[in-house]
Design a protein with these regions (language model features):
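Flexible "cap/lid" loop of the alpha/beta hydrolase fold
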Residues: 115, 122-159
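Conserved loop-alpha-helix segment in the C-terminal half of the alpha/beta-hydrolase fold
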Residues: 225-265
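Active-site loop/oxyanion-hole signature of alpha/beta-hydrolase fold enzymes
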Residues: 19, 59-101, 279
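A short loop-to-beta-strand scaffold at the N-terminal edge of the catalytic core in hydrolase folds
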Residues: 2-5, 9-25
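Catalytic histidine-centered segment of alpha/beta-hydrolase-like enzymes
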Residues: 262-274
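Gly/Ala-rich beta-loop-alpha elbow adjacent to hydrolase catalytic centers
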Residues: 102, 106, 110
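Alpha/beta-hydrolase
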Residues: 159-238
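Conserved HGGG/HGGXW glycine-rich cap/lid loop of the alpha/beta-hydrolase fold
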Residues: 18-71
């Protein structure tokens, strides 16, 4: 693995990790898998998945406002701007083709990357995100937007890190492995008071969320011609969310879309079932290569 500094065209700096082979060595080449984390996370969130993948090289990146990113709360967090960061990253790494995979909020960024740069993106995968967050653009119903922002506002934390691990472990079904903890550790920082808070903080978190609510995914989803796989994580009991069911049905009718519904999967399935997610991404890349060979 090689860590690199990346710069955006609007003057911000962040960090990416390039995984060249199973041993962490080897040339990058001109094609790679790019994994995009969700809101409040950072590039090491993907470590459990990357360590199990067979398809190389793989690039993980601290997206705008996250991890090592220097972007502040007043900067542009539109999905379009975040997607441009990834397109610029690919250019900086001399990548001619990428397979872009996004989890949660990262799914929206992945979708926009695929739509904005069709010549760059060989395939796209949205893991429990990208299509399911309600759109509430600025200028639309202000009450609805305010309600969504209030409902999705994260807790301020400021609690002992051991309490965070306990809460996450309970959310993961009572099991938080050392591997999971290592993947999540850079998400938090310990303040002078000895208490843990997210690195992104509340202000940047809400700025990213505002950008997400401004995004309408369906024009981009309808326009894609490359293979796109969409995973929906579902509870063990029968799915009763009518809005989500309509999203799944609409996604199933998209051209080139393959929908998977993972019963029993938690939203953070890359941590819960990293082998399954690694196999998904490997299969996406392999099938895309087969499709390209048949069409040439």
């Amino acid at each position: 693995m090689v860590n690199v500094v990346v710069a955006s065209s609007d003057g911000h700096v962040s960090a990416a990790s390039v995984h060249g082979s199973n041993s962490g060595q080897g040339p990058l080449g001109d094609e790679a898998v790019v994994l995009l984390h969700g809101l409040s996370q950072q590039r090491r969130f993907w470590d459990p998945v990357v360590s199990r993948m067979r398809q190389w090289p793989v690039v993980t990146v601290d997206q705008r406002g996250h991890g090592a990113s220097t972007a502040v709360a007043s900067d542009d967090y539109s999905i379009d701007r975040c997607a441009r960061d990834i397109i610029e990253l690919a250019a900086d790494l001399n990548l001619a083709r990428i397979h872009v995979v996004g989890h949660s909020w990262g799914g929206a960024v992945a979708l926009r990357v695929a739509a904005a740069a069709p010549g760059l993106v060989a395939s796209a995968c949205l893991i429990d995100g990208g299509l399911t967050t309600p759109s509430a653009p600025s200028g639309s119903d202000p009450d609805r937007r305010a309600e969504l922002l209030a409902r999705l506002r994260p807790p301020a934390l400021g609690i002992p890190i051991d309490d965070i691990w306990r809460i996450i472990g309970e959310g993961m079904g009572g099991s938080l492995t050392l591997e999971m903890r290592d993947a999540l550790a850079p998400t938090y920082e310990i303040g002078a008071d000895g208490l843990a808070r997210t690195v992104i903080g509340i202000d940047r978190h809400m700025a990213v969320l505002e950008g997400l609510l401004d995004y309408e995914p369906w024009p981009d989803a309808d326009s894609l011609l490359v293979p796109r796989w969409a995973v929906f994580c579902e509870p063990r009991h029968a799915q009763a969310d009518e809005v989500r069911l309509r999203v799944i049905e609409r996604t199933q009718h998209l051209p080139t879309a393959l929908v998977q519904r993972w019963n029993g999967a938690l939203h953070d399935v890359p941590l819960q079932w990293p082998s399954l997610v690694a196999g998904l991404v490997d299969s996406l890349v392999e099938s895309s290569a087969s499709d390209l060979a048949r069409s040439s």
